[in-house]
């Protein structure tokens, strides 16, 4: 199924299907790309940072009117985070070690747990555009190994490829074998596809932002527990209907952490340059993830997956009930500290809206 030039309409909630069925004509295949998954449990959204501007205006401040807001389903704020010092990840923190501020006001911590055993939903987003021609086999091997080592019976993963199209190669599964079969079928596509810049002739490009938006909005938004997206890409987007801002916004609303592994066949295509890398750093930072640049080195790619795996094993979940109970739509800035000299990786804030608000 493929993402067309127009943004997908929100699909009706339904039980998770074993396969996708066609819901629209070929020109509107985007509406059939994904079903909303069955909710495992009701989960309160974790904090969200303000979405970044598009790369074309990345140096300009974000205007308040341009920022969409995030609904808080219950009066509880969840903060997933990891902590590191110069020697690596810290795994023995307690509630008493940490302090959380909302708009510079200390908040009483209600819950504090390690998240190693919480169900995990992983979306792998695989760039299959021309820049990946000689590194795709490396990505396939390392990605399959990562999921084989990370997935437990209570976890699930899905696989999306993106180039001139956005394709769902594997729907939710906890079978590493099924994911590997799907990864092995991924192939480079530089021809004509169904996703394009509207009104600009033959569809072409790399629909990175569209892929992130669809993965977050249509696949992860109704899932509970920990949710991550792992992008393997050179960071360059060409032809997406979505923007950096809207794709990050979708990830924030889904409470998904975005990790980006920058990889490309730079010998033939060069690197997309500072714009793509800067966009990926902004996307990762705003969602509580990070960027790992591996060039076109297979060993460094495996190490990048190992780093993500280690981070997932050392995450914490901190929850608190805001002292300001108003669901007034204001942006609440968060600042989390856990002792001196520790690097805390977490989201930067959230918007408080009433649970029954229809606005996204």
Residue ranges and their predicted role:
Residues 2-4, 21, 32, 79, ...:
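Generic secretory/membrane-interface signal
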Residues 23-35:
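Bacterial N-terminal signal peptides
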Residues 1-20:
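N-terminal secretory signal peptides that target proteins for export/translocation
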Residues 35-41:
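Sec/Tat signal peptide C-region and signal peptidase I cleavage site
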Residues 41-360:
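Scaffold/interface architecture of coatomer-like assemblies
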